[in-house]
């Protein structure tokens, strides 16, 4: 169930394993990739850590592993939000340019109906 509203992402010292690959294109239409992995879970301004993103446009992202990712249109986790869940495969296009991101544990909420 990709994108299901029944999933909650819990911000923590992430125990999940995974990465987010960001494909970005420059003015010459050259596509390059940034792979976010490791211990870091919060990126309040991705353009500060990866200055190339100030001059390029993000085309799509690709998820690997069992983590949820939250992408925001403004720095410090503000603006529009898009949650990407494990199981969303392939190139995921966004309707905004993400500026801040969080990697999180994913937990399902189940109704007892």
Describe the function of each predicted region.
Residues 1-113:
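Compact beta-sheet-dominated domain cores in extracellular/mature segments
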């Amino acid at each position: 169930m990709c994108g299901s509203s029944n999933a909650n992402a819990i911000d923590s010292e992430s125990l999940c394993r995974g990465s987010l690959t960001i494909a970005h294109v420059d003015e010459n239409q050259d596509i390059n990739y940034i792979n976010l992995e490791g211990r870091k879970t919060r990126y309040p301004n991705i353009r500060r850590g990866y200055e190339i993103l100030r001059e390029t446009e993000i085309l799509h992202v690709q998820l690997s592993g069992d983590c949820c990712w939250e992408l925001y249109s403004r720095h410090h986790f503000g603006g529009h939000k898009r949650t990407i869940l494990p199981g969303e495969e392939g190139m995921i296009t966004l309707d905004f340019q993400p500026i801040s991101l969080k990697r999180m544990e994913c937990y399902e909420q189940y109704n007892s109906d």
